[in-house]
Amino acid sequence: MILQRDSDYSDGTVLGSMCTEPHPVAAEAFVAGLHVNLGDPYLFPNAYRAERECIGWLAETLLDHPAPEEAEGSIVSGGTEANILAAYAAREVTGGREIIVPATRHFSFEKAARMLRMKLVEAPLRSDYTVDVDAVQDLISRDTALIVGIVGTTETGSVDDIEALSDVAEDHGVPLHVDAAFGGFTAPFLREEYPLPRFGFDLEAVVSVTVDPHKMGLVPPPAGGIVFRDDEFPKAIEVYAPYLSGGGASQYTITGTRPGAPVLALYANILELGEEGYRRIAFRCYEETLKVAEKARELGLELAVDPPHLNLVNIRLPDRGTAERLLRESEREGWKISVSTKPLGVRIVMMPHLDAETVSRFLELVARVLGG
């Protein structure tokens, strides 16, 4: 079989991925929806209705929308497409050409800027790798189309102060987009017990949020999500396809044909897990993360963000040579790891397929490499 030599989440060796083994219910629903094209809603009205319900659930349960029935959005190919759509809509609504992004932004914003002929204006970071909000305020210009904040940066899992960013954005009349591709399914629950900021539509300046079901939503890829506060921004990028079944339909996603399988998988998970199920998963992963962080400290390893904001631990590495040596030793022992560049470190993403006991064995390898 062609996949025999590919990675398998179930053996606990995949340490750097933000995807994980799908929930069995989601996998079953995904297969059942293989034939569904959401780009043709007349042919698949119930799948389209399921997508509407998923967007409403995300808006209400995760994103604190005061009127979730007004939310618009789509399940798209991933966080990259979602972020591009957010930038595209902001450009069309505001007429601006600049996007203020943290230095920790996802590479999808580079793609968005190139595709949309926009300019990224980079804001510096604080010591915990969150964006410097005062610096963001100083960077706002008449050409600012969008400010971006992140809930769960790719390299350190840091959570920007979205509440403070919203205040700045509101004061200057600039839209705020939140990239919660990683943290969107966990931060709303962890905030109940840990000091994390609000980041949803209860903040006035937030106009759009990226949240990825194929990460902590336990849905098979491709399943990103873009949720807009209302229809103002998506209507600015809407296109009508007149030749579709039933007399045509409007859409604002980049792709015309869209797989329905990820939507049905998310819908199934919402029914199976619901708010309480996702809450349990979030806390279990974060509690395992804290155990890993404690083990790292015991071994004398330095965490880039301590304590971790979300279920991601980044262990600092002293130089590129050490990083390359760790990559070689990890591969030799069967670990699949990811090295970050800002800061230089090894990322351990505590997804549901991992536990602290397994990861502790890898930490001992890190300690040996750094000590040798």
UniProtKB/Swiss-Prot annotation:
EC number in record: 4.1.1.11, 4.1.1.25
Keywords, sorted A to Z: Decarboxylase, Lyase, Pyridoxal phosphate
Annotated metabolic or biological route of this protein: Cofactor biosynthesis; methanofuran biosynthesis; Cofactor biosynthesis; coenzyme A biosynthesis
Annotated positions of the N6-(pyridoxal phosphate)lysine modification: 215
Role, per record: Catalyzes the decarboxylation of L-tyrosine to produce tyramine for methanofuran biosynthesis. Can also catalyze the decarboxylation of L-aspartate to produce beta-alanine for coenzyme A (CoA) biosynthesis.
Family from the record: Belongs to the group II decarboxylase family. MfnA subfamily.
Name of protein: Probable L-tyrosine/L-aspartate decarboxylase
Organism: Methanopyrus kandleri (strain AV19 / DSM 6324 / JCM 9639 / NBRC 100938)
Lineage, opening ranks: Archaea, Methanobacteriati, Methanobacteriota, Methanomada group, Methanopyri
Designated gene of the protein: mfnA
